[in-house]
Amino acid sequence: MVIVMKVAITSGAAEGPTKLNAFDNALLQAGIGDVNLIKVSSILPRNTRIVELPELEPGSIVNCVLSHMVSERRGDLISAAVAVATSSDFGCVVENSSVNRDPEDVRSEAISMVRYMMSVRGLEIKELIVEETNHVVEKCGAAVSAVVYLD
C-alpha cells in the first residue's frame, strides 16, 4: 500500500496595528490563520502530492515549513518565499525571507538553496515550485509563505 502525503503551498501579506497583528492578518490571508502551526524542517516524504489548500478546521494542529518577515518601517519591501523540490524518492523545502531586496533575488536564492539541498542528497529534481509574496509596508506589515502538511 502506497501512502501519499499531501501538502499545500500558500502565501499572504497584510498590515496590522502591531507586528503580531500584521503577522496574524498575513496568516489569515494565506488561509492558515485559524489553525495552530507547528514549524517543521525541510524534508517531504516519498509520494508527496502538492494540492490546493483546503479549508482547515479552526483550532487544528498543522505542521508547516514557514517563511515570514515583519517590519514596522514605512516603505520597506518585505518578502517571504518557499521553494519545494520533489524527486522520485523524497523532496526538500527551503524558506527565504528578506527586507528591501529585489524579490527576484529572494526567489532565485530560494531556488538555488533547494537545488543544492537536492544535489547533496543525490536526488534528481522532478518538480520545483516557488511560492512567494512581497509587500510594501505602510505602517506595520507582514509577509508569509508556507508549505502546509495536510496528512
From Swiss-Prot:
Cofactor(s), names only, from the UniProt record: pyruvate
Gene symbol of the encoding locus: pdaD
Organism annotation: Methanothermobacter thermautotrophicus (strain ATCC 29096 / DSM 1053 / JCM 10044 / NBRC 100330 / Delta H)
Residue numbers of Pyruvic acid (Ser) PTMs: 42
Keywords: Decarboxylase, Lyase, Pyruvate
UniProt name for this protein: Pyruvoyl-dependent arginine decarboxylase
Cofactor binding, per record: Binds 1 pyruvoyl group covalently per subunit.
Signal peptide coordinates: none
Residues annotated as site: Cleavage (non-hydrolytic): 41-42
